[in-house]
């Protein structure tokens, strides 16, 4: 009798891993070029720098001219490798936190929001080492052929700085803030608004309903969490003076950026981030939901 719930849980987790991995892979392949542009904007510090990008269009033009097409896919391997466990953690833990919060007298709106926060914090712990490698590779402006491999770069970090908070887990507090805040808003907004708007019987209109809510969820979450994202990129990216660590902790980095560069510097890369995580967030939710629904019917 006790074996049935265990089998059910294993099957449910397996479905979420497959559906979440599919959602992550599709989103990464479609949206990664915008992530490269976003990271480049966030790590540049001075408009007078001859290597700085003047606009979104200018960044695309310069990257293509100097690094060619593959320049837009720098650092793509770490997020691809991380997507299956990351999305599995994201969606599976969200459901588990939601079930756990069901034992507490909370409103559905608060339940979705807190469950999203919990899933984001858990996700951040899993994904942070991959983010450290990804940001380092994206910050490299050499041609694709001249940059180190993903594994080679990870080995360099481990050899020089180790596995800890100065090495492969550098910027963990900022990553916790970035993912915790994003998932809190992303899941909280999506499921609350989706439950408020009636389901449409027409499949096309229903698809558009979900896509529109997902688009808004990703956009709003991106606007709210981007200061954490900027702090993460500064901590994990190249430091202004080689060998001297300027950016260490999340909130101290935010304060330094604000004092030296102004409030708008905390929103660097917002446009490419919204362009990526607005539609990307919608794509991810829809791919996950439709894949998971198909797996429920066929497996």
Curated annotation (Swiss-Prot):
GO CC annotation: mitochondrial inner membrane
Gene3D superfamilies tied to this protein: Mitochondrial carrier domain (1.50.40.10)
Transmembrane segments: 17-37, 70-89, 113-133, 167-187, 205-225, 277-297
Membrane topology: Multi-pass membrane protein
Domain of life: Eukaryota
Main location, first listed in the record: mitochondrion
Any one of the GO BP annotations: lipid transport
Sorted UniProt keywords: Antiport, Lipid transport, Membrane, Mitochondrion, Mitochondrion inner membrane, Repeat, Transmembrane, Transmembrane helix, Transport
Function description: Transports dicarboxylates across the inner membranes of mitochondria by a counter-exchange mechanism. Can transport 2-oxoadipate (2-oxohexanedioate), 2-oxoglutarate, adipate (hexanedioate), glutarate, and to a lesser extent, pimelate (heptanedioate), 2-oxopimelate (2-oxoheptanedioate), 2-aminoadipate (2-aminohexanedioate), oxaloacetate, and citrate.
Entry similarity comment: Belongs to the mitochondrial carrier (TC 2.A.29) family.
Protein name: Mitochondrial 2-oxodicarboxylate carrier
Lineage: Eukaryota, Metazoa, Chordata, Craniata, Vertebrata
